[in-house]
Amino acid sequence: FKLPKFKMRDIDDIEELKINYTLETIAELKAKLKAEEEGPHGYKETNYQTIKEIFNESVEKFADRPFIYEKFNRKEGFKGITYGQFGEDVMNLGEGLSKAFKLKGEKIMIIGETTYPWYVSYMAMLCGVGVAVPTDKELPDNELENLVKRSDAAAIIYSPKKKDQIKKIANKCPGVKYFIEMKSDHKIDGRFVGMDFV
């Protein structure tokens, strides 16, 4: 703990001060220091260096709390996904892309609506799988093709709504190793694969 600071002009001031550091005084100083460390609003100050650190702490701290509510199917209502499930999905995708598909450190384009699989894909990139290349879902075919080539993306993760557009440009983008469709469990078929298979 830190002792309070006193301004001293000369050596006589030390004698004059005479602070008695009893156990009570020390406990009060510790409590004051703890309150200062927690900040003015009662929040503990943090010293994060990366997004991954924030992600890991949130997943651990709020594991059972809802992260997002999403309608995965028009016939059913909203389904809640917890931080714990989100963390597990991010780690599973990250491990699959890194180890099974050998995409660690590669540029991976993500194109589609901002849905739960989009969040999982993007967070997997931020947690160290590779470099995320989030792309506007409204791009016409020729612009998407040019962006894929200029970005030097090794893989594209896309939503089912972009499937036709991706199929049109796939043959014109030989540098892309994998085209990964969100919300699909299709096994590897050439360069195409479902995200749930990863």
Regions found by a protein language model. Give the residues of each.
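A conditional alpha-helix N-cap/helix-loop micro-motif detector
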Residues: N47-Y48, V90, T114, K137, ...
